Amino acid sequence: MEYLDILNNINEEDQEIKLKPHDRVLIIDGLNLFFRNFATINLTNNNGAHIGGLGGFLRSMGTLINKVQPTSIYVIFDGKGSTVNRNNINPDYKANRNINRITNWDSFDSLEDEHESKLDQLQRLVQYLKLLPIKILSFDKAEADDIISVLCNQLSYDKNKLFIVS
């Protein structure tokens, strides 16, 4: 399974935005928070498998919820083909990104093992997030930051307090 397959499993139903004036809205760039935790938290489960991305994301989200006390939470993921538009404008967009290991410890024997763990954790994260009372948004050909921008413009008119984590 690849990253885009995981995102395709995000239900696009029930993504209507229903807020009341003065709501406190927490908006999280899902991949950004996931990758930061995956790369920096060397957390393993009882079987010795790396779960830093998953565990770190959930721990970070819990901390954010305690601090912000949101009435609504949105986790935004890059959509399928999200870099296409920017690559059309600038062919060098993200061109310098190499496929390298992003962790600096020995939890993985190879780049392939790290990649497999990353996809497994991301898939489980999306499954867990679907069980929570939050909205998960991902739209084809749109990057998370673009979706967040549109969402903020849409939500700000009712004097909602918006908290963005990216």
Range-by-range predicted roles:
Residues E12-E13:
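Catalytic core of IPPT-family isopentenyl/dimethylallyl transferases
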Residues E2-L7, I17-V165:
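Noncatalytic, basic helical substrate-engagement surface that gates or grips nucleic-acid strands
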